[in-house]
A protein has these predicted regions:
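Conserved Radical SAM active-site core
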Residues: 1-7, 12-87
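Conserved AdoMet/S-adenosylmethionine-binding subsite of the radical SAM
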Residues: 55-176
Length: 176
């Protein structure tokens, strides 16, 4: 996969591992043409648009150009903003810090809830009730609490088999 990381985020997750992406003024602006050229060079046909919070932007032009390359496009979003663009897969990861846009629930292909403490399980269930029946459900331990939360997630998933465990494999392998 090719990851396109867009700068800018006002959600403010305390555990965010890319806080350097929050201030869009700290990063250079790349043209869509440059981004498309870079993607084209990889010959990769799967693109993940992430952030920051990529849904802060109208992504129609970028996704249109990626579709011309016959790319499959995934979006990772907190769901705070309306989703504007053409996506094949939407990973919706709501945060307690900012209420999600109600229209995002019906567009989500995947609901991913970060588990920071025990109360996040009931919060996850509340959000799962609002997404479509085909939406995949994932619980991911917050990295600094991984040792504490992973066993609780495993127990929860055993008792709620509609949920899956999402692990940040790249962190276990020390790959950035």
């Amino acid at each position: 996969a090719v990851f396109i990381r867009l700068a800018g985020c006002d959600v403010g997750c305390i555990w965010c591992d890319v806080k350097e992406s929050w201030d869009k003024n700290e990063h250079s602006v790349e043209s869509i043409e440059k981004i498309i050229s870079d993607v084209k060079e990889t010959n990769c046909k799967f693109v993940v648009i992430t952030g920051g919070e990529p849904a802060m932007y109208d992504l129609t032009n970028l996704t249109t150009e990626l579709k011309l390359l016959e790319c499959e496009i995934a979006l990772e979003t907190s769901g705070v903003y309306p989703i504007i663009g053409n996506f094949d897969w939407i990973c919706f990861s709501p945060k307690k810090f900012k209420k999600p846009n109600e229209n995002v629930f019906g567009k989500a292909d995947e609901l991913k809830v970060i588990v920071f403490n025990k109360s996040d399980f009931s919060w996850a269930q509340e959000h799962a009730a609002k997404v479509g029946k085909e939406c995949k459900l994932y619980l991911q331990p917050e990295w600094s609490k991984e040792k504490e939360m992973t066993p609780l997630i495993i127990d929860f998933v055993k008792n709620n088999p509609n949920w899956n465990i999402s692990l940040q494999t790249h962190k276990y392998l020390d790959i950035r």
